Amino acid sequence: FIEMLPDSNVLRKIHADKVEDLDVAAMLDKINERITYLYDREHTIGHAFFTGLQGEHATLENLKHIFEKSIIPLLQEYFYEDYQKIQLVLGDNAKSSDELKFILDEKIVARNVFKGSIEAVIDLPEKRYTINKAALEDIRSYKEIL
């Protein structure tokens, strides 16, 4: 067995490292640095997800598809739907506006959801999380991961 960790240089070598003016390889490195910090290096995102972004296929639409169908679901699995950590990995905590966040959070007020006393119930969620489809279609959302 030979360990094969993600290698963003592969993307550079095969010219799959740019979508518009986004440095895909640098974005992958930043995502993996955060995953390593929050989880471990064995769960980093492989460069193979992005190798199809070559030539005419280096489009925002293809990048969106990779994130929507592969990267975000993988992060949901890795972090057991701990969306705060997913937000950290994707840089949503530091985005210049909410419209660029991949994961939106909305405060939930329990008394607006339930009738009667709920004090006896512990660990009620304080936020509801949703995937922001519009952010997936905006190149700035990906740039602000960096």
Which residue stretches match the model-derived regions?
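C-terminal regulatory/interaction module of P-loop NTP-utilizing enzymes
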Residues: 1-146
